[in-house]
Amino acid sequence: MWSKRDEQKTYPPIRLNPFVFWSSAISISIFGMLFVLFPETSQHGLTWIQQQVNQLFGWYYMLVIILSLGFVAWLAFSQVGNIPLGKAQDKPEFGYLVWTSMLFSAGIGIALLYYGVAEPVDHFLRPPEGQGGTVEAAQNAMMYSFLHWGIHGWVLYALVGVTLGYFAFRRDLPLALRSALYPIFGERIHGLVGHMVDGFGILATIISLVTNLGIGALVMISGISYLFPDLPNTSSTLVVTVIMMMLVATLTTVIGIEKGLAWLSRINLRLLYLLLLFVFLTGPTNHLLNGLVQNTGDYLSHFVQKSFDLYLYDKNATGWLASWTIFYWAWWIAWAPFVGMFIARISKGRTIREVVLGVCLIPLGFTLAWISIFGNTAIDLILNHGQQIIGSLVIQDPALSLFKLLEYLPFHPYVAGIVVVICFVLFLTPVGSGTLMIANLSSQGGSSDSDSPIWLRVFWSIAITIVSIGLLLAGSFSAMQSAVVLCGLPFSVILLLYMFGLAKALKQETQQPVVESHTTETSGSD
């Protein structure tokens, strides 16, 4: 027996979920105050906890990623891939171009600009094995970067997106993190169990968004300081930048998905394509083509080995593993709640196979091309043209490394200005979608594809802004980075429950197909 919502002909109006809202608001306020008032103690404490988690649960993170990869492959290539996320009469709300643009924009964020140059160069100079700065180190650096930005992370988004979309649109449960646990807990998901899951999802999402806002602010400030050296790089500049970014992000959230986030995603993708094409054509084009082919081959040939590699027999490399691979797996897991929920929100009417392949392959291809082109351009300058200054800058100020790279290409002042604009737009989409999902999780009622009241979206946007400014001014940004990684551990358990619950529901459906129900939806949003 599925949720009693199946029997309802109309949906109740959207209203605040007091338990989820207040528990989340109070929790993030306490965390924020601790980080602001005691920045050094918070940093030391979280760093110690993170080290213990990495040491004790590194193997566990690896297994969760591998299990997720296998499960998502089964979703895509078995008969269950034909099952739609919705009823037979449901059609996709967004066309393929807009849909794929939103998939990409929500899942990537500004980190692609931050790490596109910095990560490959860092691996090249400080590899886990062997000597840095060599030809072998260059080849392995790109392979490691492909690993961290490759399909391992995207399957987590696909898993959460498909699972939430299935239970929301196929089983008529709320579009909330709790709903995927219905096969395990039954009607108890509408009580304390569900409130706790949604509340933790909000906390993890806010911490992730604050971290994203911090990265965005650092890149923006670096770009503005690069373009205008006389502009003072002070706390006031940082605060003004954060407020401006969040004002526009709030506006897109208020406008909604159709008019705000969808439009931004299209602009975002076009700007990124233009920048990628510019670097490809004005850089060492033939070298970059060779690099893309070879990097892809290296990634595929080491795929299985590196998916399981814990550097058991090389203790010197375990620190690198914790700082990079385990960090990335935990980061992807921590981002999965809100990105997956957003993917579910925009994927009603599409089949499971469509969503899995769309999420895992379309953004993946662009991401790997970006890492390859920017990374190989930077490494080529260091390895073959003696521009060690790029490497030094990556170690000292990674946010500035992209702007330094552009100096070796034509029209660099103008392109640097465009990068600042791209940075601003690229920041907006994940923050906008994340804020919308937080507001939806802290409300109840309405249909599965309706959104929360505008005032609730504005509230969470303001809360994220205040927490971000406080943390950045207190110098606690690195503490927040540690916190977002730690959020990955408890949510990884929820991912395992998601796989079990979805497999159970799909098995039941293949044996006894879902009876289509026609409901009259009463909109309570906007």
Swiss-Prot record:
It is found in: Cell inner membrane. Signal peptide: none annotated. It comes from the Bacteria. InterPro entries: BCCT_CS (IPR018093), BCCT_transptr (IPR000060). The keyword Isomerase does not apply. Belongs to the BCCT transporter (TC 2.A.15) family. This is Osmo-independent choline transporter BetT1. It comes from Acinetobacter baylyi (strain ATCC 33305 / BD413 / ADP1).
